[in-house]
């Protein structure tokens, strides 16, 4: 077999293996993220206590999804990148981080993995699936699109700047990405359910029979967010953002700020020396002025004697 053809088949094999693991990772991520949300709803339904307040639900849902992503992404970070999101995959395709074949395979894996994760949650719990992304009352489709666009752009940018960009903090990228998901949920879960991920919205919708008539919002908004986040990242790269703060991502201790106490002491000594020098200059100027005045008086006296004529 021709070496180039053999290399192509090797790449396809690797892409298929990575996509298979991305399927598992997506199902794993949504199993625990959606499972936590489902448990919260079931608890409110079964409990005789008053239901939890809205803010408690928002915090619980945000924590479930954010921490599930931290754990899942960290487990799969060195295997597939831990994307679990076709919108992230699309952004990486736009900036050259994914090749077209792997992008297509990853999208298929992420969508089917989301269906599998939602199906497992539904099969393991007795209550109807209550984890669908829906527009809350008072939230229009246009508002939903823009909310999803902006929060997806934030998530995309966190992935590109923390994981795609290589620097000292790259191994800890899953933490930053998970916290970004957590923060975006705090804002948007009350309005749109905070998908930021077309697969996360698609999986439960398939299992539940698409209860949200405006389901298209969770495709248009996140993919617009991918374009926005990737475009902003590309602009930063084009203008070489690292020149603005070149020593920020280094571990060289010599790039740290100087000893503040020594700097303060040096500054104080400089001011004292400047003050002493000004004082000396002032004294010298006064002495020169006195001498000049004395010389002028002597000159005037001599001139008076010279011009004096006896009568």
From Swiss-Prot:
Regions that span the bilayer: 17-37, 57-77, 79-99, 101-121, 144-164, 169-189, 216-236
Short sequence motif NPA 2: positions: 197-199
InterPro entries named among the record's database cross-references: Aquaporin-like, Aquaporin_transptr, MIP
Catalytic reaction(s) noted: H2O(in) = H2O(out); H2O2(out) = H2O2(in); nitric oxide(out) = nitric oxide(in); CO2(out) = CO2(in)
Biased composition annotated in UniProt, kind: Basic and acidic residues: 288-298
Pfam families to which the protein is assigned, alphabetical: MIP
Coiled coil feature spans: none
Family: Belongs to the MIP/aquaporin (TC 1.A.8) family.
Record's protein name: Aquaporin-1
Organism, as annotated: Laccaria bicolor
Gene name per UniProt: AQP1
């Amino acid at each position: 077999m021709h070496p180039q053809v053999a290399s192509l088949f090797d790449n396809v094999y690797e892409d298929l293996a990575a996509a298979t693991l991305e399927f598992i990772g997506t199902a794993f991520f949504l199993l625990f993220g959606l499972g936590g949300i489902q448990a919260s709803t079931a608890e409110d339904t079964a409990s005789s206590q008053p239901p939890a307040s809205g803010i408690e639900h928002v915090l619980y849902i945000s924590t479930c999804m954010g921490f599930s992503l931290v754990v899942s992404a960290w487990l799969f970070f060195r295997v597939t990148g831990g994307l679990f999101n076709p919108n992230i995959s699309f952004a990486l395709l736009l900036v050259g981080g994914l090749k077209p074949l792997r992008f297509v395979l990853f999208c298929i894996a992420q969508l089917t993995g989301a269906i599998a994760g939602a199906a497992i949650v539904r099969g393991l719990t007795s209550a109807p699936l209550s984890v669908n992304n829906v527009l809350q009352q008072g939230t229009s489709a246009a508002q939903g699109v823009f909310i999803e666009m902006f929060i997806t752009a934030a998530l995309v940018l966190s992935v590109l700047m923390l994981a795609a960009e290589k620097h000292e903090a790259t191994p800890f990228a899953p933490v930053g990405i998970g916290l970004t998901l957590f923060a975006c949920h705090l804002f948007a879960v009350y309005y749109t359910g905070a998908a930021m991920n077309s697969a996360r919205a698609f999986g439960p919708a398939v299992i539940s029979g698409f209860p949200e008539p405006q389901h298209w919002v969770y495709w248009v908004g996140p993919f617009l967010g991918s374009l926005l986040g990737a475009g902003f990242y590309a602009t930063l790269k084009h203008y070489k953002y690292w020149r603005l703060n070149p020593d920020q991502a280094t571990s060289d201790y010599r790039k740290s700020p100087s000893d503040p106490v020594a700097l303060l002491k040096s500054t104080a000594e400089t001011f004292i020396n400047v003050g002493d020098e000004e004082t000396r200059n002032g004294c010298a100027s006064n002495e020169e002025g006195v001498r000049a005045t004395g010389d002028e008086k002597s000159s005037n006296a001599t001139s008076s004697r010279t011009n004096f004529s006896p009568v």
